[in-house]
Regions:
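Hydrophobic face of amphipathic alpha-helices that form TPR/SEL1-like repeat modules
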Residues: 19-26, 53-62, 91-98, 127-134
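TPR/TPR-like (Sel1-like) alpha-helical repeat modules
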Residues: 104-122, 129
Length: 136
């Protein structure tokens, strides 16, 4: 799979680059390399591929990977969410809920969870319901 993704990525296919990034992030068929995954996700994100923005956001929000930077993660999740990526919206909601990289705001978190839900992510619906039940 890595060779096929590499060939597609070299040919300018964003999905190939994103798939290769996933392989490097998880060490599947290639040696695990978070920096390489980050470079690939950045390439996808810069080219308008919102899944790359989400993948890179996860790398920045997890300090075991490329160095924790919640503000950078929030920017990436925002870009992904603006592009219609449900997981990006939900992840941005989480950052708002816990005040990571952004000022804590439960109403804003709920708004992003709702958008994730509207985009078809059940986890977003669950998170929205949880905050709704708490009165936010």
């Amino acid at each position: 799979a890595a060779q096929l993704f590499q060939k597609a990525c070299d040919g300018g296919e964003a999905l190939g680059c994103n798939g290769l990034g996933i392989l490097y992030e998880n060490g599947r068929g290639v040696r695990q390399d978070y920096q390489k995954a980050a470079q690939l996700y950045q390439k996808v994100c810069d080219g308008g591929g919102v899944s790359g923005c989400t993948g890179l956001g996860f790398l920045y929000s997890d300090n075991k990977r490329v160095g924790q930077d919640y503000q950078k993660a929030a920017q990436l999740f925002q870009k992904a969410c603006d592009g219609g990526e449900a997981l990006g919206c939900n992840s941005l909601g989480i950052l708002y809920k816990y005040g990571q990289g952004v000022r804590q705001n439960f109403s804003t978190a709920k708004e992003y969870y709702g958008k994730a839900c509207d985009l078809g992510l059940q986890l977003g619906c669950d998170n929205y319901r949880e905050l709704n039940e708490k009165g936010y």
